[in-house]
């Protein structure tokens, strides 16, 4: 039987791609959106695999957050529904890039072409979120 792909599998795959390009200074506006999306998938893996809703309403909330593209909303769910505290260094890094998924992909009032500064912010958030996620997974697996 073939192994089911998880949010972590997709996050790790894009992490390698993102970091290769970052390390080789291949910067493009899509890197900002990809950085946010990688962070989303790391956090969504924790929710998908470890959140245990006890009611239909809680199950609906879980499904809704797994479709969200707001890092703040995803972090709030982890704090409120799963009692997982995200270190301020990690949450602050994600707050900086929250919104890049849309503002760097589509034209509009808040859209912009991401530059090196935003790509560096995205890389920082990705690294911190990855480290946090792998640590949380390890802790949850030990329970």
Model-predicted regions and their roles:
Residues 1-143:
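Terminal alpha-helical segments
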């Amino acid at each position: 039987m073939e192994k089911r792909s998880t949010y972590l599998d997709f996050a790790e795959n894009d992490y390698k791609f993102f970091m290769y390009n970052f390390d080789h200074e291949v910067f493009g506006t899509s890197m900002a959106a990809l950085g946010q999306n990688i962070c989303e998938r790391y956090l969504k893996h924790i929710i998908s695999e470890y959140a245990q809703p006890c009611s239909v309403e809680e199950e609906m909330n879980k499904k809704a957050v797994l479709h969200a593209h707001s890092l703040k909303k995803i972090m709030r769910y982890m704090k409120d529904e799963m009692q997982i505290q995200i270190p301020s260094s990690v949450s602050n890094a994600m707050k900086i890039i929250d919104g890049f998924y849309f503002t760097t992909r589509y034209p509009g009032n808040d859209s912009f072409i991401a530059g090196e500064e935003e790509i560096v912010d995205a890389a920082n958030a990705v690294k911190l979120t990855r480290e946090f996620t792998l640590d949380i997974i390890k802790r949850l697996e030990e329970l």
